Amino acid sequence: SNTRNFVLRDEDGNEHGVFTGKQPRQAALKAANRGSGTKANPDIIRLRERGTKKVHVFKAWKEIVDAPKNRPAWMPEKISKPFVKKERIEKLE
């Protein structure tokens, strides 16, 4: 019931995908898994919370890690794990 929608924005203010999550961080992790950022060169993810003027700005990257020991059969041995780091919140005018 308290799922929030976050819209992915680019530098020009175009809005692309919608990621859902209870927290902005949860949505950012989903977005990070689609990106191509690395720890040395992270992506910048800008998520606008739908219905608000707040844009959550994250640095995002993913690393290839070993899958957990108890992974389901369909999961490969190496998985990409997303990381996000909150930078700031911007207010839209």
From Swiss-Prot:
Please give a single GO biological process term from the UniProt record.
Answer: DNA protection
Q: Which cysteines bridge via disulfide bonds?
A: none
A Gene Ontology molecular function term of the record: DNA binding
Q: Does the keyword DNA-binding apply?
A: yes
Keyword terms of this UniProt record: DNA-binding
Annotated segments matching region Disordered: 1-44
Which parts of the chain span the membrane according to its record? Answer: none
Instruction: State the function annotated in the UniProt record.
Output: Protects DNA against thermal denaturation and modulates transcription.
Output this protein's name: Chromosomal protein MC1
Q: What is the lineage of its organism?
A: Archaea, Methanobacteriati, Methanobacteriota, Stenosarchaea group, Methanomicrobia
